[in-house]
Every structure is written in C-alpha cells, then in structure tokens.
C-alpha cells in the first residue's frame, strides 16, 4: 500500500512525528544519483546500509544477489517496539527500470521533481525508500513510542519480483505489510492486484528449400501464425491476454523449422487465468498438428492475485493513518504486480 506518512502506521495512535522536508528531499536527490538498474543495485543497498546503521538499525543482506546474477541481495531488519501493538512490515525495492544509470533529479520551482530527460527519475521505487527512511528517522529521532516494525528492501523487483521470491519468509514476524510501490497522489492504496502468467511456445517444423522442395518442409512460422490468429488478445472477459513476441526463420528461401511465440495472461481470478492458459496451449497444439509441426509449451506464474479486505486490519490501520495525517484515503485496483503479491501468499 502507498502511504502518505509511514510514521503514522509505525507510531502509537495519536503520536505524530515531525517530517523534515529538506532532509527528505536531500535523501531523494542522493539516492537518485546512484545507478540502480535491475541486478545492479549495490550502490543503493550500500547507502541504505549506512543510513540505517547510523540510526542503530542493522540491515541484514541475504545471498539473493549471487543466486539471481546480481550484485546485491535483499535487506532485512526487525526493530523492537511496543509489544502490545502488532508489528508491521514496511517494504520498497532497490532497483529501477532502465535507463537507470547517470540519473539526476531536477527540482523545479513549481515543486515538481523530474529527471533531466536522459534517464528515468527512479522515483519507482526510490520515493518509497525515502518515505520509509524519513519516517523511521523521525520516529527514532523524536523518541516516539512505536509498534515493532520490520524493514524489507528487495532487489530485482522490476524483473517480475525476482529478488523477493528468494527471500526466506520464515524470518518475518509481521502479518501486516505495506509496500511503497504505487504511483499517484499520496493517500492511495491498491487493495487488489492480478495474477500474471507468462507463456512461451516453441514450434518445430522441418527446414526445406522454399523453391526446390517446399513440399518437404513443415512451416513452423505458419503454424505459429495460425495459432496466434485464434488467440483473442486485449480484454477477454475478466482477463487480459497478450501475444507479445514472435520470432523465427533463417532466410527468405528456407521453409522455417522453428518459431517462438511469447505472451502473458493477467487476471484477478487466479483459477480463471490458469484456465485461459490451458486454452491457449490447446490452441497451440492444434495449430502445430495441423501443419505437421510440434510445439513445446511452457508457462510461469510470476505472481498470484490478491485482494485485501477493506474492512480488515491492514486497511483499517491505513485509514486511521490517513485521517491523522489529514489525507483522504483512496482504495484502488491495479493491473500491475508487486512484492505485495508475494507477501499475501505468506
């Protein structure tokens, strides 16, 4: 969930900590200046390790980086607090979509912050990182009573949450999690997100010369094209379906013996999304057989749909925090996946 002031979630009810805007913006400027493309988050992680260590919080880094081919892992810490209150988890990711090297934050007179136009700004998710950092700093600096809280900053979120999938969830104590990874005005929170399923179909035919012996060939691209023509794309009932890439062939005068098709299915009903994936595979198999080809169909569930009950504890705590901060809460639905999909599974 995207929160206006994480200190409202962390603190005892009625306790409001002072947010230092200049410090907050300075931290954002510094974080943005650090290169952090997916799998290359080392600089951001090192800065977070130093900043939290200065607050007396020891972030622990796991070995995820080495496993996924990156240079940084997931960072985690538990901070004790008032045991009469339930602990909460605050989370943000450390990577950004490319181009994420050579970033520079430009502060405009009207209050806007943009990149210089040559890269992304990286507010996704460095704005979330800064919100959490400033909130934690303010709570500890003011000596405010607070609930126990956990921090989890994951690597490689932009590549379908690769980092968080390797985290040891048995370490977590909190049953309430807030993920700072939603765009829009402060006060918005996503309570529902879809399953995201990808598929890959490799059609195999038989190569032959397209002029001298075309009848000896088995046309893999034609088989793939026949399949794609039968797959409805866009909004399909409650789902979205997309064929994203198709590639094959070696030369204009060769009957292609190989063609690869990739795509995805998204939906808020996980079983329905799986059913659609099965239907797509069946279409692929029939089209391949009709052209004398074979097809190898594989799929992967990148994340599973969730829905948070607006009447539940997580949402109610969020509503209370918004009220104390003078914000109008807005519950929204998102069509994107995030770390929260994985937290909801645990």
Region roles according to the model:
Residues 15-39, 301:
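N-terminal capping segment at the start of a domain
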Residues 37-84:
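A non-catalytic alpha/beta surface segment that caps or lines the substrate-entry region
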Residues 60, 220-346:
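Metal-dependent amide/peptide-bond hydrolase catalytic core
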Residues 78-123:
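Catalytic-core environment of secreted peptidases
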Residues 114-123, 207-213, 249:
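A short glycine/serine-rich beta->alpha loop
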Residues 119-194, 234, 240-245, 252-253, ...:
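Acidic/histidine-rich catalytic neighborhood of metal-dependent amide-processing enzymes
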Residues 132, 177-213, 217-227:
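Phosphate/diphosphate-binding glycine-rich loops and adjacent basic-rich segments that engage nucleotide
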């Amino acid at each position: 969930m995207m929160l206006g002031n994480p200190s409202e979630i962390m603190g005892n009810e009625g306790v409001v900590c002072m947010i230092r805007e200049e410090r907050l913006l300075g931290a954002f400027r510094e974080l943005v200046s650090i290169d952090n493309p997916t799998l290359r988050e080392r600089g951001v992680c090192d800065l977070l390790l130093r900043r939290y260590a200065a607050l007396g919080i020891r972030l622990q880094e796991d070995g995820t980086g080495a496993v996924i081919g990156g240079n940084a892992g997931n960072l985690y810490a538990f901070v004790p607090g008032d045991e009469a209150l339930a602990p909460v988890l605050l989370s943000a990711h450390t990577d950004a979509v490319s181009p994420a090297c050579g970033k520079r934050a430009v502060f405009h007179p009207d209050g806007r912050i943009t990149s210089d136009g040559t890269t992304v700004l990286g507010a996704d998710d460095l704005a979330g990182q800064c919100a959490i950092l400033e909130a934690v700093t303010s709570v500890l600096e003011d000596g405010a009573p607070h609930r126990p809280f956990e921090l989890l900053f994951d690597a490689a979120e932009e590549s379908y949450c690769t980092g968080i999938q390797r985290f040891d969830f048995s370490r977590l104590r909190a049953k309430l999690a807030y993920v700072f990874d939603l765009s829009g005005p402060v006060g918005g929170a996503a309570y529902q997100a879809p399953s995201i399923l990808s598929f890959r179909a490799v059609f195999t035919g038989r190569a032959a010369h397209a002029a001298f012996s075309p009848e000896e060939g088995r046309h893999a691209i034609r088989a793939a094209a026949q399949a794609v023509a039968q797959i409805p794309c866009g909004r399909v009932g409650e789902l979205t379906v997309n064929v994203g890439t198709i590639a094959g062939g070696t030369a204009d005068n060769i009957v292609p013996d190989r063609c690869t098709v990739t795509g995805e299915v998204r939906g808020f009903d996980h079983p329905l999304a799986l059913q659609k994936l099965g239907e797509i595979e069946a279409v692929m198999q029939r089209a391949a057989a009709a052209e004398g080809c074979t097809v190898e169909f594989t799929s992967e569930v990148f994340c599973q749909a969730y829905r948070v009950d607006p009447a539940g504890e997580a949402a109610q705590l969020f509503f209370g925090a918004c009220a104390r901060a003078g914000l109008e809460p807005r519950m929204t639905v998102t069509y994107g996946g995030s770390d929260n999909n994985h937290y909801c599974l645990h």
